Amino acid sequence: MRYLLFIALLTTCSILQAQSLRPKSIYASYFGETVTHPGLKIGVTYQLKFWDKTKTRKNGDKRIIQRSIELSPGIGYQTGLFVLPEWSYSRKNAKGNFLTAGIGAGYMRTFIPNVYDLNANGEIESIDAGYNYFLTNYSITFGKDLSVKKMIPISIYIKPQLMYALPNATNGISYFALELGASYKLTKN
């Protein structure tokens, strides 16, 4: 546990110390594999590239499309802790609705509660048990940016994702997870 927290601290500190990258937003969300495995996910979003395009339709309405490529390192808790940076591509329309596709790779440490073993003296003692995994995820995010119409610097989103953990079983194991959250914007884009 100490090592995982130390690695998470080093990763976060190295990203935050980068002079060219400023955090775009911070987020917190419900994160769960199913209703029976609820968890919490928190993180920061960094925008690596941004561009927008305005199109005028035949009826005279303007359509603004904003695109960005983002990096979102996050720390989450489900049946363990994970550090999972994500690369994502996002499109947002003039009404504030957005669609984001993302992929990520990181580390997950699971914990198994109430595990006991015999020590050298033959006494029963509680031990820390769990596994280390390489974790990948693939996600699509559907959301609404409330700052477009209501001037509130918050976005709300739903993010279904497929996660794949190695080593587990013979060929790894897949998880379907759902994330429901809110993001507070620190910048104007």
Regions found by a protein language model. Name each.
Residues 3, 72, 104-106:
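Histidine- and/or cysteine-centered catalytic micro-motif in compact active-site loops
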Residues 3-12:
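Sec-dependent N-terminal signal peptides
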Residues 18-80, 185-189:
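Short glycine/proline- and aromatic-enriched beta-strand/turn motifs that initiate or cap beta-hairpins
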Residues 80-189:
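Outer-membrane beta-barrel transmembrane domain signature
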Residues 11, 19-21, 151:
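A generic structural signal for short, non-catalytic loop/turn and secondary-structure boundary residues
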Residues 8, 18, 32-34, 59, ...:
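Generic marker of residues within folded, mature protein domains
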Residues 4-5, 29, 60, 127, ...:
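Generic structural signal for short, flexible, solvent-exposed coil/loop and linker residues
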